[in-house]
Structure formats: structure tokens, C-alpha cells
């Protein structure tokens, strides 16, 4: 088995604890750094050197399915796909087949300064875009000149995609062959994104220009920080004890009410032609069982993929987690084409240039479509030949 990051470090203890209850097949775990894992999977496939089982980033599933590296989840294992969040399962569904089993989940919510919102008359950030922006203006006035309301680094695409998903924008057409950035829903989201910078609510800065996110959050340089569940631990360890009652989490806003976000996390796949596939699915079943999900959450802090696990373990007792549970129920899958990571990188390059005055909103949307269409050229040919998933 190949595994990455914190999960790879936790696997020996996780497997040992699971084995104590119900013996599992012997599993040899090879840890991979996240930065090298995607390339390792592709070269492993090309060289016929893949393992039986692997953890994969959810955004890689479409590519691995397209090249024939992974097997669909067999009917006999369909029970592993029950009790899961719909949007996460949808991320694993390509061409009417499900190719991976979600292992743990994440998404992005707002980390906000509870004390500063209370000072301006809000218990939490409002759920509608217009009201939310009005609240940000009040918070910005309260923190004074030189400070902002929200941090949305211009080199990070997740902030724009969150707004786009909240506006129900597709970004890629239904066939996955052309960009849909010029569609009204995305243009509205892009215009709203731009307004946050134009109105001085967000600094025009990349992540590398913020020297210490935690210090800046504590001193009020920004009061809203959209991020994932890993930030809970960072807030608890990097902010002083006396500051712990001054921050909270809230779901994302949307145009007319609660917004959306992309479902993230990792899934487990079994590779095509693996000799020990049946045993591998047994391991997947153990990792997705109630005990496996609880142990993984305790060892890594990851949010369980199985919904029932949220009510039976520490995730249920953590008040900061509630916003993530709410957000996962309204999450929407990102486009599932192998080229998506390159497309979304180009999207953000254009978005940053728009913020710096090179494009209007409509010009930026058209440029995004142009770049997406160029990247999707091969896919259009494959669809025309009936060769895509």
C-alpha cells in the first residue's frame, strides 16, 4: 500500500490496532510525500510498478480512471459506498462508475474572529453574500486603517472555486469538453470575488506575502480566513490560550443563502490487475469500518468519510467541527476531467491578472474559457471517438 503525509505516518499504529480486533492480511506500507505522490502514481503505472492498494487525492481519480490504472469499486464492495456524503461519492463517480472509496473528507469553511464580529453586532458571518459583505465592511471599519476583513491569497484558486460552487457554476460543460467560465453563474461569482478586492475587504497579496498567518489573524489584520479542518489544530496550538474563545468556524455564504464548497480528502483505490485485489478490498473494508474511522480520526485529526462516524467519535464533540459537517452536506463536486488541475491553475492565473487590472470580469471569463478549451482539445477528440469515460 502507498500512503501519504500524516496518514502514512499513522498507518502502522492504525493497522496494529485494527489487527488486535480482527486479523488483517499483512500490509506493507510505503510512505510517499504529497509533493511527489501524483508523479509516482503515473510513473508506477507506466512502469508496471504499482502496489495493490493506495491512498489517492480525490482530484486524481478521474486521471487514474482515464488511463486505466484503477478498477471500479466491485459490486461486492458496494456497502463501502453507503453512509457517505453525496458530494464526496460524486467526486469518485466517473462515467457512471465509482472508482474509489472515500477514506476521509475535508472541505473549506470560514475561520473567523468571533470577538470582532460580536463587536459589530453579529453572532457569526451571515449566510447571504450581500449581508456577508456588509458585515465584512463593518468589521473592516472596526479594525481600522491598514487592516482587512478577509484573507484570500491571490495565488490560491480555492477561494474562487468556493464562490463559483456556491453560485452553482459548472466551470466545465456537462460533456467535460469545453470551459463554461463565461456562463452567467460563474461570471456573477467572478464579479463578486473581484468586488472583495476592489472594495478593500481583502488584501491583494499571495500566501507568501503573509509572513505569519496566525499572528496576523490574532492582531486583526484580517478577521476571516477560509481554510480546511487542519487549521483547527493550528489555531489551537499557534494562538495563545487567552485567545481561544475569540475565534470560531462558520459555513460559507452563498448568493441567496448558505453556500457550498468542494469536497476534499483522500480515497482508497485498488489497481487494475492487482493479484491480491480481494485481500486489498478486505483491508479497505476494515479502514472504512467504525473502528477504523474512529482510530484514523484520533491519530490524524482527519474527518471521517462515513457519516455515522461523526456521531460516535470525537468529531461529534468538537464544536469547531460542526461547520464542516454542515458544509459537507451542501458540498458540490468539482469538474471531473483529468485536465482539471491544470485548468484551475490557469483559471487562477487569469483571475489574479484581472484583480491587477489586466482584464475586466467578462474578458477574464473569456480568457479562462480559451485556456480551458486549449487544455481540453485532446479530450474533445477522444469524446468524438467514443474513447473517453
Which residues are covered by each model-predicted region?
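Extracytoplasmic "Venus flytrap"
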Residues: 1-14, 32, 158, 334-339
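Extracytoplasmic/periplasmic solute-binding protein
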Residues: 99-103, 108, 133-179, 222
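Short, polar/charged alpha-helical segment
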Residues: 6-26, 347, 365
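C-terminal lobe and pocket-closing loops
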Residues: 229-244, 254-349, 381-389
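Hinge/lid segment of periplasmic solute-binding proteins
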Residues: 58-109, 133, 161, 244-253, ...
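Glycine-centered hinge/linker elements that transmit conformational signals in sensory
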Residues: 136-138, 178-206
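Short, well-ordered beta-strand elements
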Residues: 1-6, 25-30, 52-53, 99, ...
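Extracytoplasmic "Venus flytrap"/periplasmic binding protein-like
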Residues: 16-86, 91-93, 118-127, 216, ...
Amino acid at each position: 500500500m502507498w500512503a501519504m503525509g500524516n496518514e502514512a505516518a499513522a498507518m502502522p499504529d492504525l493497522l496494529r490496532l485494527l489487527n488486535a480486533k480482527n486479523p488483517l492480511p499483512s500490509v506493507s506500507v510505503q510512505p510517499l510525500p504529497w509533493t511527489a505522490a501524483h508523479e509516482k502514481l503515473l510513473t508506477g503505472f507506466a512502469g508496471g510498478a504499482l502496489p495493490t492498494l493506495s491512498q489517492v487525492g480525490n482530484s486524481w481519480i478521474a486521471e487514474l480512471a482515464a488511463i486505466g490504472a484503477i478498477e471500479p469499486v466491485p459490486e461486492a464492495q458496494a456497502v463501502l459506498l453507503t453512509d457517505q456524503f453525496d458530494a464526496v461519492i460524486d467526486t469518485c463517480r466517473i462515467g457512471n462508475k465509482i472508482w474509489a472509496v472515500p477514506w476521509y473528507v475535508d472541505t473549506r469553511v470560514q475561520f473567523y474572529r468571533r470577538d470582532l464580529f460580536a463587536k459589530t453586532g453579529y453572532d457569526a458571518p451571515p449566510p447571504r453574500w450581500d449581508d456577508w459583505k456588509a458585515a465584512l465592511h463593518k468589521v473592516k471599519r472596526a479594525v481600522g486603517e491598514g487592516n482587512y476583513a478577509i484573507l484570500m491569497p491571490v495565488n490560491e484558486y480555492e477561494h474562487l472555486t468556493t464562490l463559483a460552487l456556491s453560485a452553482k457554476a459548472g466551470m466545465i460543460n456537462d460533456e467535460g469538453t469545453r470551459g463554461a467560465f463565461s456562463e452567467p453563474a460563474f461570471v456573477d461569482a467572478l464579479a463578486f470575488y473581484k468586488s472583495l478586492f476592489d472594495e478593500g475587504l481583502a488584501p491583494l497579496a499571495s500566501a507568501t506575502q503573509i509572513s505569519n498567518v496566525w499572528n496576523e489573524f490574532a492582531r486583526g489584520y484580517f478577521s476571516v480566513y477560509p481554510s480546511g479542518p487542519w487549521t483547527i489544530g493550528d489555531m489551537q496550538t499557534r494562538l495563545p490560550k487567552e485567545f481561544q474563545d475569540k475565534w470560531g468556524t462558520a459555513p460559507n455564504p452563498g448568493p441567496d443563502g448558505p453556500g457550498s464548497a468542494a469536497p476534499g480528502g483522500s480515497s482508497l483505490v485498488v489497481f487494475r490487475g492487482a493479484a491480491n485485489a480481494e485481500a486489498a478490498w478486505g483491508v479497505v473494508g476494515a479502514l472504512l469500518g467504525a473502528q477504523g474511522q474512529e482510530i484514523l480520526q484520533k491519530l490524524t485529526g482527519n474527518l471521517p468519510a462515513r457519516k455515522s462516524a461523526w456521531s460516535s467519535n470525537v468529531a461529534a464533540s468538537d464544536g469547531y467541527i460542526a461547520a464542516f459537517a454542515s458544509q459537507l452536506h451542501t458540498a458540490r463536486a468539482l469538474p471531473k476531467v483529468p485536465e482539471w488541475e491544470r485548468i484551475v491553475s490557469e483559471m487562477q492565473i487569469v483571475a489574479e491578472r484581472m484583480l491587477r487590472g489586466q482584464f475586466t470580469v467578462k474578458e477574464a471569463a473569456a480568457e479562462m474559457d480559451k485556456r480551458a478549451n486549449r487544455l481540453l482539445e485532446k479530450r474533445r477528440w477522444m469524446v468524438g471517438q467514443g474513447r473517453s469515460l
